[in-house]
């Protein structure tokens, strides 16, 4: 067992982390995390619902009726992703020994530079700083000067900005950032009685920039869509950081002797999600946005997912109230079991052996959980979590979104399931986080702690091991009722 100095304990306490949590993390480094036991990859008819075209309007009507009630609907947008990875090829060009574009990527970038949404503002910067337009600089062979003004702080600083604040989309006479596209989307499907609630999770160093951007553009979109925006921001809590260790599993220390903590990954956001108060929450990543001309599908299928969620939640609440009242017979219990198995895809081997109070307790426990409906698209080789039927610690089988790291690569059946999976999850979720009495669930209670992930990293040339928390839409929502609905690829545009 590791002995922490008073200074260590002070550092741990300042982060809001308990010593017992640190000790548990150190144990997890030693033991590792178990792979999940799988039953099958989900497919249409086996865990994935394919809604007939004629039924889509029924669910959209349900959603529109729901919005007319006294409800709070919120768009929750993980937006801390840095843009630096998007520009790795341009950073490589800046440090290359040659000055003119040579690779296919570099040639394509410069020959199409006018098509980028940031072109006009970059051109303006080049004229102000160099007295030359982008094209004049290129004609002089100053390609790196153009890239320098794009990526670094002397110009637009895109290499240091988050993706949400880059000009992504070009329209006639204007351009939009992903942050703005989410404002537009919110008005189109998450507008409840003229109010649109959005919550962006951002990194601390960029919070002011996001706030400035919203304050700058909000009025324009409020006028355009005749809505009022309520926009809030949060950052990952320091208490969700995880301790880093050396290869021998002893705590890694910085050069000043202090412990090294690292962000716990997107799974840390379950705490942020737990802090927002809403009846229905749409979750979609910041960079998954489409131009207006393609938004019709996005809006239609977001409303479809929400309608499916409202339909299933209404039925689950009805059954929970019945179970609570005691006014049911055996046929009703069989009906509830069918709903749990056929609609929520939650199976318990040997359920027929449960009787009376034991069966009622089981049904209550499984129905009285947060619920999410996830859009899944046909697999075209994009990276993303896969929809699976997986075993839970209580022996039940339910739907989960799994990443490749959660699957045992030495199990040929499992790797075949993963590689031959028909669908993937593009992080397109609609969530219900309140119970049938209208009280909020405490979301950390529904996390499967055994689904974390250990990765190898380095700092200052020294190897270390890092611990990632169960992913937000993976293990952090493991104990939710999960439903998959097929949506078209046109709704996914990272």
Task: List each language-model region with its residue ranges.
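Long, compositionally biased intrinsically disordered regions
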Residues: 2-44, 362-367, 372-373, 380, ...
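Domain-scale recognition of functional cores that engage charged ligands
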Residues: 10-13, 31-34, 38-380, 384-385, ...
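Short conserved micro-motifs at the rims of enzyme active sites and ligand-binding pockets
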Residues: 88-89, 244, 293-295, 413, ...
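Conserved catalytic alpha/beta cores of large enzymes that bind or transform nucleotide phosphates
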Residues: 132-140, 287, 302-341, 418-494
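Short amphipathic beta-strand starts and helix->beta connectors
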Residues: 183-187, 411-414, 469
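Residues that cap or initiate secondary-structure elements
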Residues: 206, 381, 408, 435-437, ...
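C-terminal, active-site-flanking charged/polar segments
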Residues: 281, 391-426, 435, 451-455
């Amino acid at each position: 067992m590791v002995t922490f100095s008073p200074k260590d304990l002070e550092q741990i306490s300042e982060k809001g982390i308990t010593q017992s949590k640190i000790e548990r993390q150190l144990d997890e480094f030693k033991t590792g995390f178990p792979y999940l036991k799988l039953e099958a990859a989900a497919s249409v008819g086996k865990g994935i619902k394919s809604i007939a075209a004629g039924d889509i309007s029924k669910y959209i009507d349900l959603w529109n009726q729901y919005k007319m009630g006294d409800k709070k609907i919120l768009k929750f947008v993980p937006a801390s992703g840095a843009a630096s990875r998007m520009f790795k090829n341009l950073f490589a060009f800046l440090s290359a020994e040659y000055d003119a574009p040579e690779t296919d990527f570099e040639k394509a970038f410069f020959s199409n530079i006018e098509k980028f949404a940031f072109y006009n503002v970059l051109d303006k910067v080049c004229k102000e700083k160099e007295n030359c337009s982008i094209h004049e600089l290129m004609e002089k062979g100053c390609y790196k000067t153009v890239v320098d003004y794009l990526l670094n702080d002397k110009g637009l600083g895109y290499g240091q900005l988050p993706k949400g604040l880059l000009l992504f989309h070009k329209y006639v006479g204007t351009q939009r950032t992903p942050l703005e596209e989410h404002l537009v989307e919110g008005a189109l499907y998450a507008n409840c009685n003229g109010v649109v609630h959005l919550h962006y999770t951002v990194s601390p160093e960029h919070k002011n920039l996001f706030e400035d951007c919203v304050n700058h553009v909000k009025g324009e979109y409020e006028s355009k869509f005749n809505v009022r925006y309520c926009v809030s921001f949060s950052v990952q809590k320091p208490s969700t950081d995880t301790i880093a260790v050396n290869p021998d599993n002893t705590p890694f220390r910085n050069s000043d002797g202090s412990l090294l903590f690292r962000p716990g990954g997107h799974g840390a956001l379950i705490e942020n999600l737990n802090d927002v108060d809403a009846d229905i929450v749409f979750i979609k990543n910041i960079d998954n946005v489409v131009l207006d001309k393609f938004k019709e599908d996005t809006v239609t299928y977001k409303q479809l997912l929400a309608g499916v969620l409202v339909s299933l939640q209404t039925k689950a609440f009805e059954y929970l109230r019945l179970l609570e009242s005691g006014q049911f017979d055996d046929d009703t219990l069989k009906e509830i079991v069918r709903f749990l198995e056929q609609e929520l895809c939650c199976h318990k081997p040997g359920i027929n052996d449960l009787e009376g109070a034991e069966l009622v307790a089981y049904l209550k426990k499984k129905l009285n959980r947060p619920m999410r409906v996830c859009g899944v698209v046909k697999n075209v080789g994009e990276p993303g979590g896969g929809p699976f039927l997986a075993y839970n610690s209580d022996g039940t089988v339910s739907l989960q979104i799994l990443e490749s790291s959660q699957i045992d690569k030495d199990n040929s059946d499992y790797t075949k399931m993963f590689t031959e999976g028909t669908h993937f999850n593009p992080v397109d979720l609609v969530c219900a986080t309140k119970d049938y009495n209208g009280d909020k669930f405490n979301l950390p209670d529904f996390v499967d702690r055994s689904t974390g992930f250990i990765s190898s990293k380095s700092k200052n040339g020294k190897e270390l091991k890092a611990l990632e928390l169960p992913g937000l839409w993976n293990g952090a929502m493991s104990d939710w009722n999960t439903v998959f609905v097929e949506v078209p690829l046109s709704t996914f545009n990272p």
